[in-house]
């Protein structure tokens, strides 16, 4: 039983040691390549910082390289903060370019307009020659009217079908600058901006501004022409942009494996148009389609091989004249010297081949379930809605063009060849041309928010715009299983989903938590060689995102320094731009974004450092703690797991671990505070420090003064006691008097020798020499004090020894027993090991002998069989010989 008990004790000790050694503790890593989705504001960078819209953008130096990382991420062009910011920012720039500030509510009055013109353009119901009723009977094939740069009608603006611009002159009376005095004003309006009523007057019609009573309409205070701006988005310090670099990405990819990381997007150009996207940066030598995940909204990138372009022109001259309506209110009118011709656009390039490729690409799209016959896939215009929907809407240097695209659609679709019936009811629209007529409006619907704006007249003179068509905005409508329509759309926002839909914004989370077997204050401070920062750029450390956790952790020091250096560098760049452009911060949205970006970056860095500091890990790359890992079953695979994968697994533990780390740090600070109270006792060598001797002398002087004061008190008490016995020391004796007055007592003999004290004789009178006796008295008292201290210390030490002696003896006995038990167990193990060795040797010897014997028998048997086989011919020959004999 004793042996069994010893064995159980040893087993328990081994299990305890094993548990202590196998406990995992939380370790904090700073600089790990991990991230999470973010929604913070981005800022812009551009090469052309001379335009009004880019004055606050950072200078672009094309030094925005991309790094491929071995990770898998989800991308969605429609659920994307980058595209949403682009849409909002471009709208703000678009709105700022016109600077609306003057409300035109005074113009919501009845105006007297030229009836001939209102009838001509069909505003009063008396249509002139503008429309003709057409039946839906079959029509013969119509010849195409295709023009190019060499066609003379382009120069003369005299191409067939183009008419005069529909404009109407109106008059109205208002109270002007003089009180109670009306003034008549003359203005010229585009016909589509007015709504008129029948009037009894034969020469005038009663007209109003269209929708003036239902919307807040504003006019520009100053004219800024909406020219295209090229810029790129950049992430603030501490953030990054991921891009899906897969050619098969179609707007939504839950698992994109070809991912690159950068600090900025590609260059993009501001686009504001319906139906088409112009001058985009995503055009490639192929056609591809971004398809919304939950609807039929699409954005189609056209093949740049076909060189698709659109050229628009507003012919003839115009004169712009400001009209003062009242004090502080000015409206701009357009007096017409002669009837101008309408604006128009023509298309160049291989449009038919491009549209055919769009149809073929649509058939191959995984989301498409309609007919596979491209001849039954039609490119159509929307059925109705706002003018920006039914017409192709674009801006040409300040002029807002609304182009009727029927001629163009007939041309690219060859509609007269498809069954012989036209889908339009107007014979004028039954033509096939590569150019289209456009009308101009001064009151337009806003494309991002509900509302209307009145724009200033554009520049005077002839205006021409040239654009490259790079995309189509469309919705896929399945009429039935045999027919599909590609319906053009007015979703301007889709243009930016194509431009930036393959990006996603992430926040770098450099703080990682993982279990290790190292506990705080148990590591040895190994010396490290100083290294310079490995220049990978700000996001260089994310190149290790696809590496295993162990490999990434080796370079945490360099990664964290690179992270900090990149943050500081970008902070300085932003600060320089803000300082240079302080006076322009209110011009565009970028000034505010730059400030907000800087604040965001500072807040993120301070937040990370504050969190590390609350854990006691400030400015450390690897920080071991005393907090046990809360989930023993969740252990990282350091050789085959990335930090991003690990962070996703432990995300649910982060709050609990954070709380435990903070509590442990608070407890550690309390312990340090208690330890600092004993700071003078931690190192005994400090007692002999030269600076401590002054303090020791002070303590000695205070002790001496205390002893003297104590003795004075004792002397006073004794003196009072002697006075009660009949003695009276004289304190006020003259200097020559050296002896007290003798005081006689009775003749009774003392009961004990020396009862009355030392110094007097045994007679009837005594005296006390004050000066000498007091010195002797002090010496005796000091001797008594030292003797008492010595006796007390000796007794205390003796008692301590007597108390500790049994404990020490018991501890010594226990250690001897443990040593004896360990010696016996080691002897058992040695004996067992020797027995095991002997058994293995005996088994090996037996197996060897058995194998040798068996091999000998097998070899002999094989020899016999072989000899028998070899003897067969001889036996046959001998048999034949015997037969012949």
Curated annotation (Swiss-Prot):
Residues 677-698 are annotated as: MPER. GO terms for biological process: membrane fusion involved in viral entry into host cell; symbiont entry into host cell; virion attachment to host cell. The record marks 531-532 as: Cleavage. GO terms for molecular function: structural molecule activity. Glycans are attached at residues 37, 70, 114, 148, 156, 173, 186, 201, 213, 245, 255, 279, 285, 296, 307, 317, 372, 378, 466, 482, 485, 631, 640, 656. A lipid is attached at residue 793 (S-palmitoyl cysteine). GO terms for cellular component: host cell endosome membrane; host cell plasma membrane; membrane; viral envelope; virion membrane. Residues 481-488 are annotated as: V5. This is Envelope glycoprotein gp160. It comes from Simian immunodeficiency virus (isolate F236/smH4) (SIV-sm).
């Amino acid at each position: 039983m004793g042996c069994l008990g010893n064995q159980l004790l040893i087993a328990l000790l081994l299990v305890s040691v094993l548990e202590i050694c196998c406990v995992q503790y939380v370790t904090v890593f700073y600089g790990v390549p991990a991230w999470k989705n973010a929604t913070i504001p981005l800022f812009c960078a551009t090469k052309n910082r001379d335009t009004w819209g880019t004055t606050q953008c950072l200078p672009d130096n094309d030094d925005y390289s991309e790094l491929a990382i071995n990770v898998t991420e989800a991308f969605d062009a429609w659920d994307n903060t980058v595209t949403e910011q682009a849409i909002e920012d471009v709208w703000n720039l678009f709105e700022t370019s016109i600077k609306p500030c003057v409300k035109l509510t005074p113009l919501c009055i009845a105006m007297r307009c030229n009836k001939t013109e209102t009838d001509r353009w069909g505003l009063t119901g008396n249509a002139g020659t503008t429309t003709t009723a057409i039946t839906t009977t079959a029509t013969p094939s119509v010849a195409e009217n295709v023009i190019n740069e060499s066609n003379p009608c382009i120069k003369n603006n005299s191409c067939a079908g183009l008419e005069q611009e529909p404009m109407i002159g109106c008059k109205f009376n208002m109270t002007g600058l003089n009180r109670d005095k009306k003034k008549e004003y003359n203005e010229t309006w585009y016909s589509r901006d007015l709504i008129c009523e029948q009037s009894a007057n034969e020469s005038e019609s009663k007209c109003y501004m269209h929708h003036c009573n239902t919307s807040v309409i504003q006019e520009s205070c100053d004219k800024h022409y909406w020219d295209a701006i090229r810029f790129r988005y950049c992430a603030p310090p501490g953030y990054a942009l991921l891009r899906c670099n897969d050619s098969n990405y179609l707007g939504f990819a839950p698992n994109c494996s070809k991912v690159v990381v950068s600090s900025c997007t590609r260059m993009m150009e501001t686009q504001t148009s319906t139906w088409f996207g112009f001058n985009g940066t995503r055009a490639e030598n192929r056609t591809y389609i971004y398809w919304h995940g939950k609807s039929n909204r699409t954005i189609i990138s056209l093949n740049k091989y076909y060189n698709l372009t659109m050229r628009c022109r507003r012919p003839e001259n115009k004169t712009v004249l400001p009209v003062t309506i009242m004090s502080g209110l000015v409206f701009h009118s357009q007096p017409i010297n002669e009837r101008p011709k309408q604006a128009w656009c023509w298309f160049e390039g291989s449009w038919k081949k491009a549209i055919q490729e769009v149809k073929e690409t649509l058939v191959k799209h995984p989301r498409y379930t309609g007919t596979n016959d491209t001849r039954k896939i039609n490119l159509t215009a929307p059925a109705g809605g706002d003018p920006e929907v039914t017409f192709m809407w674009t801006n040409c240097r300040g002029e807002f063009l609304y182009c009727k695209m029927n001629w163009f659609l007939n041309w690219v679709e060859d509609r007269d060849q498809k069954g012989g019936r036209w889908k339009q009811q107007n014979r004028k629209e039954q033509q096939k041309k590569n150019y289209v007529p456009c009308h101009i409006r001064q009151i337009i619907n806003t494309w991002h928010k509900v509302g209307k704006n009145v724009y200033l007249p554009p520049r005077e003179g002839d205006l021409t715009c040239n654009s490259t068509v790079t995309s189509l905005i469309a919705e896929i409508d399945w009429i039935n299983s045999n027919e599909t329509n590609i319906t053009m759309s007015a979703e301007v926002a889709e243009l930016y989903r194509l431009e930036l839909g393959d990006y996603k914004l992430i926040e770098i989370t450099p703080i990682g938590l993982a279990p290790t077997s190292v506990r705080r204050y148990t590591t040895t401070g190994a010396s490290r060689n100083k290294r310079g920062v490995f220049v990978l750029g700000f996001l260089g450390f994310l190149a290790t995102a696809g590496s295993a956790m162990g490999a990434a952790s080796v370079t945490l020091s360099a990664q964290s320094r690179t992270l900090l250096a990149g943050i500081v560098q970008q902070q300085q760049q932003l600060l320089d731009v803000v300082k240079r452009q302080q006076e322009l911060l209110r011009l565009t949205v970028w000034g505010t974004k730059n400030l907000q970006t800087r604040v965001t970056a500072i807040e993120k860095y301070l937040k990370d450092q504050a969190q590390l500091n609350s854990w006691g890990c400030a400015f450390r790359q690897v920080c071991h703690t005393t907090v046990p890992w809360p989930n023993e079953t969740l252990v990282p695979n350091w050789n085959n797991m990335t930090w991003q994968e690990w962070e996703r697994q432990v995300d649910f533990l982060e709050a609990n671990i954070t709380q435990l780390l903070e509590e442990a740090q608070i407890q550690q600070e309390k312990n340090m505070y208690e330890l600092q109270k004993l700071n003078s006792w931690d190192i005994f060598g400090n007692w002999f420090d030269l600076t401590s001797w002054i303090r020791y002398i002070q303590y000695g002087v205070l002790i001496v003064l205390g002893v003297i004061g104590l003795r004075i008190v004792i002397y006073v008490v004794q003196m009072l006691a002697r006075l009660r016995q009949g003695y009276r020391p004289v304190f006020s004796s003259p200097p020559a008097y050296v002896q007290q007055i003798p005081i006689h007592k009775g003749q009774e003999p003392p009961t004990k020798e020396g009862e009355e004290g030392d110094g007097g004789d045994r007679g009837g009178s005594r005296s006390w020499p004050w000066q000498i006796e007091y010195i002797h008295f002090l010496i005796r008292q000091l001797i008594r004090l030292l003797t008492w201290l010595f006796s007390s210390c000796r007794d205390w030490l003796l008692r301590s020894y007597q108390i500790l002696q049994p404990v020490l003896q018991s501890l010594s006995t226990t250690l001897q027993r443990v040593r004896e038990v360990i010696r016996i167990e080691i002897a058992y193990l040695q004996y067992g090991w020797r027995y095991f060795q002997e058994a293995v040797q005996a088994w090996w010897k037996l197996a060897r002998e058995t194998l040798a014997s068996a091999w000998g028998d097998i070899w002999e048997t094989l020899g016999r069989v072989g000899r028998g086989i070899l003897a067969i011919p001889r036996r046959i020959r001998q048999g034949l010989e015997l037969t012949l004999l």
